[in-house]
A protein has these predicted regions:
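Membrane-integral, polyisoprenol-dependent glycosyltransferases
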Residues: 1-348
Length: 348
């Protein structure tokens, strides 16, 4: 317990120094920060918590959550650069702590500590955490979703997500309604058990999907598409490894291209996909996501006669996928640019 408290105190201290120091001491940067902050300020002055505007014109770039957070901050601190950025900084401190608890549950407290320390000191994350943009909010809620998932699975499996020793006490397994609750025996120290999907108990899955609902309010469809794709791929790989251990799959032979094709067919078979969908209650989960996010989308659509929905989904989502926007035209060998930028942005 003392180790956990020391780790968390150290991480909070480092994160607060990185994300809060001189937060309002410089002007809003680039185009996104001024537009987002001004949009929030206009809503604040009107007392409007529903329709985002910039220069009194409808702003369809991003959903409402980043503006709600700004409105709360403006109410407490007044309209300023500091208050426009405060929510992003606070949530980035939260993401740092979530990464610690995610890492210590997956591996160990030491690994979780260094993973979160590396995250909060990386250049791009520290920049995002000091900007009045929705990115820090999206990162926080997706990280929260996966932290909930990992901790619930570990709770169902006596405090252990994937086998081996953990730094937490075993807990009671989930009760009735879970098809996997009684399938895992108590493990001896150092044993290895393959990861299993979230149990068939939708109540335990609720925190995961509630967090995704807020991610959708932060940045739209990417808030559900990204975590759903990650979780689905994890489950499909897990099921394939399980079937290999149980010798349900035929050995793959032949040249590399044939082995690769056979592996993909095994990985993305319909039975395995349906098992993954049922395993984490994607049907019920989609309903939970809608319950969190849909009321505002419906309300803003009605208030603007559908103009906000058309602008956001058709222009800023579908349009961005089909054509260049906001001077992001790309250039030959642009992938090399991202190879360099990714390495620099993750420094040190």
């Amino acid at each position: 317990m003392r180790l956990l408290l020391r780790h968390q105190a150290c991480l909070v201290l480092v994160a607060v120094l990185i994300f809060m120091t001189n937060l309002g001491g410089y002007a809003l940067f680039n185009e996104d920060e001024p537009k987002n902050a001004t949009c929030g300020a206009e809503m604040f002055r009107r007392g409007d918590w529903l329709v985002p505007t910039f220069n009194e014109s409808l702003r369809t770039d991003k959903p409402i959550l980043v503006y709600w957070l700004m409105l709360v901050s403006y109410t407490v601190f007044g309209v300023s650069e500091f208050s426009a950025r405060f929510a992003s900084s606070l949530l980035s401190v939260g993401t740092t702590l979530l990464t610690y608890h995610l890492g210590r549950k997956l591996y160990s407290a030491e690994i979780g500590f260094f993973a979160s320390l590396i995250l909060c000191t990386s250049l791009l994350f520290s920049a995002v955490g000091r900007a009045s943009t929705p990115d820090a909010t999206l990162i926080f809620f997706i990280t929260l979703a996966f932290t909930c998932y990992v901790w619930v699975v570990a709770w169902q499996r006596n405090g252990n997500f994937s086998g081996g020793e953990q730094d937490c006490e075993p807990q009671q397994q989930a009760g009735e309604g879970s098809t996997l609750a009684n399938t895992t025996d108590v493990q001896s120290p150092g044993s290895r058990v393959e990861p299993r999907p979230l149990p068939m108990n939708w109540r335990l899955a609720t925190p995961f999907f509630v967090a995704i609902g807020f991610a959708v309010l932060a940045k739209g469809p990417v808030g559900v598409v990204l975590p759903a794709a990650i979780l689905m791929l994890f489950l499909l790989i897990t099921f394939r490894e399980r079937d290999q251990e149980l010798e349900k799959l035929k050995p793959i032979a032949g040249p590399w291209w044939r082995r690769g094709g056979s592996m993909l067919r095994q990985l993305f078979g319909w039975e395995r996909i349906l098992e993954a969908v049922r395993g984490v209650h994607f049907g019920i989960g989609f309903g939970i996501v809608l319950a969190v996010a849909l009321p505002w989308y419906l309300a803003v659509g009605i208030k603007t006669d559908g103009n906000w929905l058309r602008g956001f989904f058709l222009d800023h989502n579908l349009g961005r996928a089909l054509s260049a926007k906001e001077n992001h035209n790309g250039f030959p060998f642009y992938s090399l640019y991202y190879l360099v930028v990714i390495h620099l942005s993750c420094f040190p």
